[in-house]
């Protein structure tokens, strides 16, 4: 699977680096590419692991998170920095962090850490491009993480995850059957 992730990263780099546009547009484009790549990678992991339950859980978590996001978008109808509507919460941040949390909780930090890094870039790109305010992407981030956390269970086998509390930091080792 690591070869698959490497190929995706190389493809994304070539797509982003080969386009002759301003840096501002590249950041937005990179975020737009990654917002598709992250859920594709999450779904791809479930297929690579032959994990039908994981496929179902990823679908449920994505539908839950995006359902909450769209309900809030229509209920709040906040104006975007560029004058558009439905700014809060960011759908890009929601699905990116939903995918990252799914990969982290289901398959462990070795998949979750890179996914969280890319999801953070997606959120940054939305603010940098003038599509959202920081509070919009923070709202989307929270919804995405909570939506996946509530639905996703660790994959059978060993799972290593970082853990932090009020007065400690450590590593949690889980075994699922």
Per-region residue spans from a language model:
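Interfacial segments of alpha-helical transmembrane regions
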Residues: 45-64
């Amino acid at each position: 699977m690591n070869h698959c992730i490497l190929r995706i990263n190389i493809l994304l780099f070539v797509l982003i680096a080969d386009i002759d546009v301003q840096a501002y547009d590249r950041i937005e484009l990179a975020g737009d590419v990654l917002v598709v790549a992250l859920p594709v990678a999450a779904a791809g992991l479930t297929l690579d692991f032959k994990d039908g339950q994981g496929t179902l859980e990823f679908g449920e978590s994505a539908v839950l998170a995006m359902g909450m996001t769209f309900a809030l978008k229509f209920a709040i109808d906040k104006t975007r920095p560029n004058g558009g509507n439905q700014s809060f919460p960011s759908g890009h941040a929601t699905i990116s962090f939903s995918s990252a949390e799914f990969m982290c909780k289901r398959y462990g930090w070795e998949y979750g850490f890179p996914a969280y890094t890319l999801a953070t870039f997606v959120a940054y790109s939305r603010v940098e491009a003038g599509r959202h305010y920081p509070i919009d992407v923070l709202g989307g981030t929270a919804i995405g993480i909570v939506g996946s956390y509530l639905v996703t269970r660790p994959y059978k086998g060993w799972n290593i995850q970082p853990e932090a509390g009020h007065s400690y930091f450590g590593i949690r080792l889980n075994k699922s059957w």
